[in-house]
Amino acid sequence: VQDYKMNNNVYKFFPQPVFSYQVDNYQNLNKKLKKFILDEFEKDKAGIKRSNINGWHSKPFRFEKGNIALEFAKIIEKYIFNSFQQYGWPFIAEKVKITEMWSIINKKNSFNESHIHPNNYLSSVYYVQAPKNSGNIVFNNPNPVSRNKFPLDIKKTEYSANIQKIQPKE
């Protein structure tokens, strides 16, 4: 195969970032969250059906004074604000709201189907527990044209990949 190396400019129009943060004091936080999630599971083993296949999905959390869901929401505010700043979005901190939060328990052969969270500026995921070999979080290219027709590629690049995976960490 002939190599066609050239000097050129590459303009990365409309990139789709995925921000990754390590939450401060996550080990202690994860212990509290795990207890809260398992308590929620014990109260409602049926859970609700959303994108989960063979896994458990909680009802949306109530942000009540003194519960870990509210504490967690306050802890992650600075990461949300940082993401807004990186996008260059003006915001008033008091007006930024988490619209919904829930937990998922996926065991072996459980997963979540590809889905979106509409009517939000950002979506996020936080892993309380992520054992080795528990699978990846998979992101699909949101550009609809990318799924229509594309040439066979020899090597996946940031320009040609329609799926990207990240190994979750606690």
At which residue positions do the language-model features occur?
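Intrinsic-disorder/low-complexity coil detector
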Residues: 1, 14-16, 59, 143, ...
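Non-heme Fe(II)/2-oxoglutarate
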Residues: 3-92
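Generic secondary-structure boundary/loop-capping signal
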Residues: 15, 53, 58, 95, ...
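A residue-level signal for beta-strand positions that form part of recognition/binding surfaces
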Residues: 18, 100, 136
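Solvent-exposed, well-ordered amphipathic alpha-helical segments
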Residues: 28, 32, 100, 163-165
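Short, charged N-terminal helix-start/capping segments
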Residues: 34-53, 97-122
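Active-site region of the double-stranded beta-helix
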Residues: 67-99, 107-121, 128-133
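Catalytic core of non-heme Fe(II) oxygenases with the double-stranded beta-helix
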Residues: 103-170
